[in-house]
Amino acid sequence: MSTGENIKRIRNIRGMTQKELGIAIGIGEESASPRMAQYETGNRTPRESMLNKMAAVLEVDPRNISIPTGYREEDMIYRLLAL
């Protein structure tokens, strides 16, 4: 999975909308949902500082967002929790 797919997966596990996550990391209310959609689809790449904010809000290690899935034991845990 890509960084964007990881953001979406973890956001969904946490039960947050794109807008809620965007606002929580400091994006303006009107821009929050479109910007998060850009990150999740890979049309825009979040800076490291933005990834760190997302990780803090989503309560995960930043590496869980930026490292491709399939390489971490945590991935299996998240997949199991999502069932």
PLM regions: where:
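Residue-level signal for the short linker/turn that defines the boundary of a DNA-recognition helix
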Residues: 2-5, 15-16, 31, 46-49
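Short basic helix-loop element that most often maps to the first helix and adjoining turn
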Residues: 5-26, 79-80
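DNA major-groove recognition helix of helix-turn-helix
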Residues: 25, 40, 50, 58, ...
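Recognition helix of helix-turn-helix/homeodomain-like DNA-binding domains
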Residues: 26-45, 67
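DNA major-groove recognition helix of helix-turn-helix/homeodomain DNA-binding modules
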Residues: 43, 47-64
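Short, charged recognition helix plus adjacent turn
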Residues: 66-83
